[in-house]
């Protein structure tokens, strides 16, 4: 899984590659109602959560990556995909107030861009919770350490930084994400022969109060484009 954030004049583009078992069922992005809030996201049908969600009414967006546990458990009561949805519905959300022992390790990114932009990174490794404020004026890339080694991430990060001068549109950023997508059971993955591949890419483009959500399902070679959300 990769996430990239690219700031623009009066806006930004946040993009996500999803690496998952290619047989895991997913719905393309659509609107759902949660506690009177309209939330837009692609839905994981196994647990009902998501990895990328938008609350356009409140101008907030969130995405999540899996992370490595220091002492992994067999099961966790609370789904990371459900945690993501809670973070986008609850405007007073604070991960530090949650029962962290019930949540698998993850990196949760939340960005509120309504009046006073706040971009937070929550990193939970089952031992420590670190909370960082992200500089919204600087581009950034994240990578899931459950699937990619530190060395592999460094390669991808350097490629991202070298490409920044051309990463100015949704199409160019999507092409970058396509270039780092992985085929079925890629040798790059730390988890071997688990039926994993890059199954989709999701990109949200916000600029001067106009926005759109672009989703490409690589399994079905199908595009979903939602505008004026």
Please place each PLM-identified region on the residue numbering.
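N-terminal nucleophile
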Residues: 1-229
């Amino acid at each position: 899984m990769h996430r990239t954030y690219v700031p623009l004049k009066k806006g930004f583009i946040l993009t996500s590659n999803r690496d998952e078992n290619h047989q895991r069922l997913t719905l393309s992005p659509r609107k759902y109602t949660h506690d009177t809030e309209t939330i837009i996201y692609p839905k994981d049908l196994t647990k009902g959560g998501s990895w990328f969600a938008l609350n356009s009414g409140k101008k907030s967006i969130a995405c999540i990556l899996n992370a490595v546990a220091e002492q992994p458990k067999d099961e966790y009561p609370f789904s990371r995909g459900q945690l993501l949805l809670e973070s986008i519905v609850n405007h007073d959300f604070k991960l530090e107030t949650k029962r962290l022992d019930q949540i698998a390790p993850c990196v949760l990114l939340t960005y509120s861009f309504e009046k006073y932009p706040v971009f937070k990174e929550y990193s939970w490794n089952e031992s420590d919770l670190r909370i960082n404020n992200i500089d919204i004026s600087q581009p950034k890339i994240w990578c899931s350490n459950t699937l990619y080694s530190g060395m592999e991430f460094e390669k991808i990060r350097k490629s991202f930084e070298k490409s920044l001068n051309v990463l100015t549109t949704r199409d160019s950023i999507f092409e970058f994400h396509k270039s780092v997508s992985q085929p079925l059971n890629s040798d790059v993955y730390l988890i071997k022969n688990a039926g994993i591949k890059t199954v989709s890419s999701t990109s949200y483009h916000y600029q001067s109060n106009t926005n759109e959500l672009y989703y490409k399902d690589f399994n079905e070679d199908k595009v979903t484009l939602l505008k004026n959300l």
